[in-house]
Swiss-Prot record:
A molecular function (GO) term: glutamate-1-semialdehyde 2,1-aminomutase activity
HAMAP family (alphabetical): HemL_aminotrans_3 (MF_00375)
Organism of provenance: Corynebacterium urealyticum (strain ATCC 43042 / DSM 7109)
Annotated family: Belongs to the class-III pyridoxal-phosphate-dependent aminotransferase family. HemL subfamily.
Modified residues (N6-(pyridoxal phosphate)lysine): K283
The name this protein goes by in its record: Glutamate-1-semialdehyde 2,1-aminomutase
Pathway the protein takes part in: Porphyrin-containing compound metabolism; protoporphyrin-IX biosynthesis; 5-aminolevulinate from L-glutamyl-tRNA(Glu): step 2/2
Primary location: cytoplasm
Gene Ontology CC: cytoplasm
Length: 447
């Protein structure tokens, strides 16, 4: 099917004819042809490449084209693709069985690694970031005996009913305020305020006195574009939230699904030192397989069944193959790896800035550690409203020129760019060359 998006030219469509055919087949059996909406290229147009293999920093598609990967499976692949040590750990574990329905030492090893690197005292392993945040919210409600959750506009915590209200990520990409199917009752238990607006947080607690179980926040947002939770003067928004939550008998849930073990050895906790009462993890902790975790203070975690009254379970939770992948990924994620990630992010940002400046394109690089996004407006965006108010119309043209020149960037202006340690000098040279037409396209784009 030919695209009607003006950012996708006919020559590019022809180069992707095998991927286009694969997408047509996918649409016969899968809604929209994808199993997660952001993969559908809804905000940029065109058809996503169908990936057949990946190695190091490179993706290969059904048309035989290769791409420098700056999506990294939306975060997990900090070491690049098919890292031999991770692949060997998966193969070795799989050869001894795929799932047992009984405890294994691997899940204890991964839990111990998480505890040793972060503020949490006990961990429960689950299968996805959504499951982690859903379970953390249930536990917070069970522990406090309260029903309401305070979240921030533009922050995304998975597709949990109550947390999809005014969410970011794919919800922002498709311009949805929430989602049909979410009941009024679920929405009524969610209090939403603008991000980094501490007075709005105080007001919300005053208006819902004794009802809010927890504040949930991304450690630093990456689903409305990248927004730092540490202000220009060094103030930690998370520290302010924790103080207010505790003063009102509520908990602080820090969502580190995206930031955990990506922005540093200790995740975002290593950046601001703010320990959530509960913390969620995903992406990097899985090594690329379906796994996630949540943890926190021992007295709270011990409210979980079988030792406490709050029920949470999963047939494949703690799956040995996923545990082996996650553990191998974390073992490789030492301080040298994070220095490389930081240097790679810095180098990419420098190239983007240089290219856009050359074409006089107004922009600001939104950065939080090794995560960043491009905001097509002057100055820092600090909340969802400011991020949406930028010249977002410039991004599709920018994106497609990058894609046509072998760079796989996030297919939405509201998503974070991710780097890996596998990037090479040749990759940076390819990126620099691709930025020349991409910056020109961004400059020429019209609303």
């Amino acid at each position: 099917m030919a695209s009607t998006n003006t950012n996708v030219n006919a020559a590019a469509e022809e180069r992707h004819h095998e991927s286009a055919a694969a997408m047509e087949r996918a649409r016969r059996f899968i809604p929209g042809g994808v199993n997660s909406p952001v993969r559908a290229f809804g905000s940029v147009g065109g058809t996503s490449p169908f990936i057949t293999s990946a190695s190091g920093s490179q993706l290969q598609d059904a048309d035989g084209l290769s791409y420098v990967d700056l999506v990294c499976s939306w975060g997990p692949m900090i070491h690049g693709h098919a890292h031999p040590e991770i692949v060997e750990a998966v193969k070795s574990t799989a050869s001894r069985g795929l799932s047992f329905g009984a405890p294994t030492s691997l899940e204890v090893d991964l839990a111990e690694e998480i505890v040793n690197r972060t503020s949490v005292e006990k961990v429960r392993l689950v299968n996805s970031g959504t499951e982690a945040t859903m379970s953390a919210v249930r536990l917070a409600r069970g522990f406090t005996g309260r029903d309401k959750i305070l979240k921030f506009e533009g922050c995304y915590h998975g597709h949990v009913d109550s947390l999809l209200v005014a969410a970011g990520s794919g919800v922002a990409t498709f311009g949805l305020p929430d989602s049909p199917g979410i009941t009024k009752a679920a929405a009524s238990d969610t209090v939403v305020v603008p991000y980094r607006d501490i007075e709005a947080v105080k007001k919300a607690f005053a208006e819902n006195e004794g009802q809010i179980a927890a504040i949930i926040t991304e450690a630093t947002p990456g689903n409305m574009g990248t927004v730092s939770s540490i202000t220009a003067d060094g103030t930690s928004f998370n520290a302010q939230l924790k103080e207010i939550a505790h003063a009102n008998g509520a908990l602080l849930i820090v969502d580190e699904v995206m930031t955990g073990f990506r922005v540093g050895y200790q995740g975002w906790f290593g950046k601001d030192g703010v320990a959530g009462d509960l913390t969620t993890f995903g992406k990097v902790v899985s090594g690329g397989l379906p796994a996630a975790a949540f943890g926190g203070r021992a007295d709270i975690m011990d409210h979980l069944a079988p030792v406490g009254p709050v029920y949470q379970a999963g047939t494949l939770s703690g799956n040995p193959v996923a545990m082996a992948s996650g553990l191998a990924s974390l073992k490789l994620a030492d301080e040298d790896a994070y220095r490389t990630l930081d240097a790679n992010a810095e180098r990419l940002i420098g190239l983007i800035t240089e290219a856009l400046n050359r074409e006089s394109v107004e922009h600001h690089i939104q950065r939080a550690g090794t995560m960043f996004s491009v905001r097509f407006a002057d100055g820092e965006g600090t909340n969802f409203g400011e991020m949406k108010a930028a010249d977002t119309f410039r991004y599709p043209a920018f994106f497609h020129e990058l894609l046509d020149n072998g760079i796989f960037a996030p297919p939405s202006v509201f998503e974070t760019w991710f780097v890996s340690t596998a990037l090479t000098d040749a990759d940076f040279e390819r990126f620099e060359a691709a930025l020349v037409p991409a910056a020109k396209a961004a400059a020429a784009a019209e609303a």
